[in-house]
Each structure stands twice: as C-alpha cells, then as structure tokens.
Amino acid sequence: MTVSVEELKVLLPELAGRVLVAGAGVSGVGITQLLREMGCAVTVADSNSAQLDKLAQQTGCQTISPADVVSDGFQDYTVVVTSPGWRPDSPLLVAAQSAGLEVIGDVELVYRLDRAEVFGPKRTWMVVTGTNGKTTTTAMLAEIMQHSGARAAAVGNIGVSVADAVRTQPRIDVLVAELSSFQLHWSSTLVPDVGILLNLADDHIDWHGSFAQYAQDKAKVLAAPTAIAGFDNGHVMTETTRIQRAEDADPIIGFTLGEPAKGMVGVRDGQLIDCAFGDNVVLRSAEGIEPAGPAGLNDALAAAAAARSMGVSAVCIEEALSKFEVAGHRGQCVGRHREVVAIDNSKATNPHAADSALAGFSSVVWVAGGQLKGAEIDELIVRHAGRIKAVALLGVDRDVIEDSVRTHIPGIPVLSVSETDPRRAMDEAVAWSVSQAEAGDAIVLAPAAASLDMYTGMGQRGDMFATAIAQHLHD
C-alpha cells in the first residue's frame, strides 16, 4: 500500500468507519484479509459459525450472524461489501439498502482502491463478460497482451482474484478480468478501460429476478470508453440500443462472424478482418482457431478487437492465437481415431452454449443431459437436426431431451442411460457413442444442462468423458 491508513480514509470515506463484509466464503475471506491489511475495522456476517470463528482467528475481525445484523441495525457501519454469491434479495442486503447503507461487491471495492492509487498508479482494466465464452476470451486476450510485452494477467474468475492482482509483485499493469453478472451487479462505479460483452442468453434468472435485470447488469461493461459487443446476438443488440453513451464517446465496436462493416471486426474470405482499428487489416486465418467452431471464432474476434484497441499489431495477435491452448472442458479435443474426433465441451451447461459447441461440426454423435433447470431445449434440437446423427442421454432431465429429439429428429438412434453412478453412466454413454460414430463424425459432449445431478461439477463430468473416450475410441 502506497498511502497511509489516514490517507486511505480520506481517499475513500466509506472505509473510514467499520466495514461489514457479507459472507465468510472464499471471496469474503479475501476481502477481509485485504481490508485488515489496510488497517480497516471489519465485521464479517455469515450464518456459518465455524467459518466465522476460523476467519476471526486468521484476521482478527469481528463476526456476527446476519440475523443479528438486521435486528441490531446498521448504525455502526459505513459500507457493506458483499460476496458475489449473496443474492440481492438477501434479508441483510435488503435491510442495509433500506437503511441507506451502500452495498458494493468485492470487485467494486478493488476498483475503487485502484482508482485511488492505493496500490500505485492506476491499472488498465479490460473486462470480459457474457453468458458463454468468458473464460476462453479472457485467456485469449491475456495471452495476446502478454505476447505484446504488456505486464498483463487473466484475473477475476480465472487466474488470481482482483484483490490479489493489485498487490502482486512484480506488478500487473493490465488486468484482463473475467467478471460474472453477480460481480457486475454490485459494481456501481466500475468503468473499465475496455469492456467486452460477448453474448446474452437466459441464465441466473433466479438470482437477478428477471432476464432484463441480468442483461442490464452484464451490459454495464459497455460504459467503457472502448466498448466491444457481439453484434450477432439479438439480446446484445437490444442492450447496445438501450445504453446511452456519452456524447463524446466512441461508438460501440462490434464483432461478427459475417462481413464486417466499418467499425467492426469480422470474417471475410476465411480471414479475420479489422475494420475498426485499421482499414481492412487482415489479422489471421479463421482456420485452426481453438476451440473449433463458431464459439471459438467469436472468442478470438472479441479478444483480437480488444487487443487492437490497445494498439497491438496483427502479427502479434496471429502469433499469440496460434500458440493458444484452450482450457479444459471448453471444446478440447480429447480423442482422435480413424477420422473420428471426441470433443469435451462439458462447460456447455445451457442450450446457448451447446448451440455453439454443436455448430462447429457437420456430423455429430451428441452426448447430452443433466439438469436443464427449466431451459427450453426444442429450439436447439431443431437448429441442429441436420447434423445430429445419434444421441446419448444421461442425467435427471434426459427424458425431456429424448422427447424433443424423437419429435424433431425422428428415426435417429437414441440411448437413454438410466445408470445413476456417474462413472458407469458416462462409460455406457461413450461406449455406445463410439459404436455409432463413423469417419468424419465428432462425438461431442455438450450437455446443454448443469452437472450437479450426477457429478461434483462440469470438470468431473468432462474428465470422466475423456477417460471413457480413452478406453473406447481405439482399435
């Protein structure tokens, strides 16, 4: 910290009194440690008394139950810093706002500290959000920025937390931050230098209360001086129309899989073309970008546009993307034999993500199923009826998907796996899928559903898919 405690409290008056941290989980621990290191008085509220006791021993903070905070009142506090998992309708947060107390998130707090130069000169914030593709785009952009020579790092929901990133030595100058709608909801003053909104589809509606609120929270990144948005997505276009940018602000930069107009980045004749930060500048070939298919290409276009806005050359972008390796469970090729490929896209936990995953292949043996959480599946199946040749289904909502497949793609082979043991279920699905696949086919795990009905997470689901592929996709 480059300022004294007294100077900090002048720069950020909300930290001059006692700070109430909502949540003693991973995020709450990180924020409490940060605040205590800066000399702030902190009380942490959580219903888990064991976690509170542990945190109090670690940091010396005071602790309290959420119910006691609400009953005692908020007169002792100057601000609430909430963990992103706490919903806006949580009684403590509702009561705090009703009492006139500001509620902010962990990212917003760190942003204010950075703008106040508490940890040295202000950093460059490049924020990536969207329903799908955030992690891949963030990783791509961080790779490009690092290749350009910038002291950049992927932070936020991948890499290190933003709280750690502003204190890391050697210093990180460019924060390429993947942020969720939860984090953006509680960010009232965050205006990144570059903001990217990839896409929007139904997600986390139970947390936000409505799709409109979810979309508005995501679209906060478009307040950035350099705003970049996926113009092929109808919901994104609705938000770009709704947002009133400053009169002197540059127009929003669009990226598209089609022909780019002026002020856009897109694809022409198999090449990524920049018509926003150059005059028809060829960035690289669209072929060979990982992950394969429209999703990976969209991610690369968004990352390239953001890098170009920072003055990065086309040569640097081409070199960085050529060596980029996709993270696990996001379109990773986990097997290849006799012109059959196996693709792990376990991260495709909703129909929108599965749409992009399936679109990258002309003939697919589809492995799907899990918790649909009420998501509509018919449109996805109708869209890809011409490329799906067989379907293996597992998980709690497999019958819903099976009914849709039999309605919209009658006659294709369908396996419904009733086994509930996660490893045996995946093994059965994969063994059958391999038996259905022929040269030129892709066996694609793109569940279109959440994983927690059977697996500890989408990572375990993808790992078990890869293990089963290794056992069955061979001579």
Swiss-Prot record:
<dbReference type="InterPro" id="IPR013221">
    <property type="entry name" value="Mur_ligase_cen"/>
</dbReference>
<keyword id="KW-0436">Ligase</keyword>
<keyword id="KW-0133">Cell shape</keyword>
<dbReference type="InterPro" id="IPR005762">
    <property type="entry name" value="MurD"/>
</dbReference>
<comment type="function">
    <text>Cell wall formation. Catalyzes the addition of glutamate to the nucleotide precursor UDP-N-acetylmuramoyl-L-alanine (UMA).</text>
</comment>
<protein>
    <recommendedName>
        <fullName>UDP-N-acetylmuramoylalanine--D-glutamate ligase</fullName>
        <ecNumber>6.3.2.9</ecNumber>
    </recommendedName>
</protein>
<comment type="similarity">
    <text>Belongs to the MurCDEF family.</text>
</comment>
<keyword id="KW-0067">ATP-binding</keyword>
<keyword id="KW-0132">Cell division</keyword>
<keyword id="KW-0963">Cytoplasm</keyword>
<dbReference type="InterPro" id="IPR036615">
    <property type="entry name" value="Mur_ligase_C_dom_sf"/>
</dbReference>
<dbReference type="GO" id="GO:0005524">
    <property type="term" value="F:ATP binding"/>
</dbReference>
<dbReference type="GO" id="GO:0005737">
    <property type="term" value="C:cytoplasm"/>
</dbReference>
<feature type="binding site">
    <location>
        <begin position="130"/>
        <end position="136"/>
    </location>
    <ligand>
        <name>ATP</name>
    </ligand>
</feature>
<keyword id="KW-0547">Nucleotide-binding</keyword>
<dbReference type="InterPro" id="IPR004101">
    <property type="entry name" value="Mur_ligase_C"/>
</dbReference>
<dbReference type="Pfam" id="PF21799">
    <property type="entry name" value="MurD-like_N"/>
</dbReference>
<dbReference type="GO" id="GO:0008764">
    <property type="term" value="F:UDP-N-acetylmuramoylalanine-D-glutamate ligase activity"/>
</dbReference>
<keyword id="KW-0131">Cell cycle</keyword>
<dbReference type="Pfam" id="PF02875">
    <property type="entry name" value="Mur_ligase_C"/>
</dbReference>
<keyword id="KW-0961">Cell wall biogenesis/degradation</keyword>
<dbReference type="GO" id="GO:0008360">
    <property type="term" value="P:regulation of cell shape"/>
</dbReference>
<dbReference type="GO" id="GO:0051301">
    <property type="term" value="P:cell division"/>
</dbReference>
<dbReference type="GO" id="GO:0009252">
    <property type="term" value="P:peptidoglycan biosynthetic process"/>
</dbReference>
<comment type="pathway">
    <text>Cell wall biogenesis; peptidoglycan biosynthesis.</text>
</comment>
<dbReference type="Pfam" id="PF08245">
    <property type="entry name" value="Mur_ligase_M"/>
</dbReference>
<dbReference type="GO" id="GO:0071555">
    <property type="term" value="P:cell wall organization"/>
</dbReference>
<keyword id="KW-0573">Peptidoglycan synthesis</keyword>
<dbReference type="InterPro" id="IPR036565">
    <property type="entry name" value="Mur-like_cat_sf"/>
</dbReference>
